[in-house]
């Protein structure tokens, strides 16, 4: 199902991020005022894919022309998550999160964190449903107009590792 991303996926990662953001976050980043920063996002994906501590999993569409979903994680955090809007409601975000949490568990982690835009109501409902809890920490997002991000944490149920 999911596979590990390669440098060949960089543009498709950016394109999926754009599609998901434009559908879910237009109220935060109105495109007429804050156009999607395609070049900056592409540069960030280059850094993410080059980071030896991070793993990015992707799910191809059935024609392997575009990505349906991605999740990036490290030993202790879920860094990036997106599902193409055409596939919302199919449980792919849950599968991606659970896959990342399992990998963190195997690496010896007992808890995980993530940051989410406070105004990303759809994502926050999912995190709440999956047992993530807000820590009370906040920070400005790196992208203009720098909306507030909130931190979540979740215990990882120990396995046999």
Stretches found by the model and what they are:
Residues 42-58, 77:
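A short helix-loop-beta-strand connector motif used in the catalytic cores of GNAT acetyltransferases and
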Residues 87, 91-99:
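Conserved acetyl-CoA pyrophosphate-binding loop and the N-cap/start of the following alpha-helix
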Residues 104-115:
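Conserved GNAT acetyl-CoA-binding A-motif
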Residues 65-77, 82:
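Conserved beta-strand in the GNAT
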Residues 1-15:
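A short beta-loop-alpha structural element at the N-terminal edge
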Residues 18-45:
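Conserved GNAT-fold acetyl-CoA-binding loop/helix
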Residues 88, 114-124, 140-147:
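Conserved beta-strand-loop-alpha-helix junction that forms the acyl-donor binding cleft
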Residues 53-69:
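Conserved beta-hairpin
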């Amino acid at each position: 199902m999911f596979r590990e991303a390669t440098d060949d996926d960089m543009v498709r990662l950016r394109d999926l991020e754009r599609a998901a953001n434009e559908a879910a976050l237009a109220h935060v980043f109105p495109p007429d005022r804050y156009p999607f920063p395609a070049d900056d996002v592409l540069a960030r994906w280059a850094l993410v894919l080059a980071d030896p501590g991070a793993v990015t999993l992707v799910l191809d569409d059935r024609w392997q022309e575009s990505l349906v979903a991605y999740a990036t994680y490290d030993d202790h955090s879920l860094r990036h998550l997106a599902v193409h809007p055409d596939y919302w409601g199919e449980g792919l975000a849950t599968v991606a999160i659970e896959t990342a949490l399992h990998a963190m568990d195997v690496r010896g982690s007992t808890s995980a964190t993530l940051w989410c835009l406070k105004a990303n109501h759809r994502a926050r409902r999912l995190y709440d449903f999956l047992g993530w809890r807000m820590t009370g920490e906040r920070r400005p997002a790196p992208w203009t107009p720098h909306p507030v991000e909130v931190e979540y944490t979740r215990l990882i149920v120990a396995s046999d590792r």
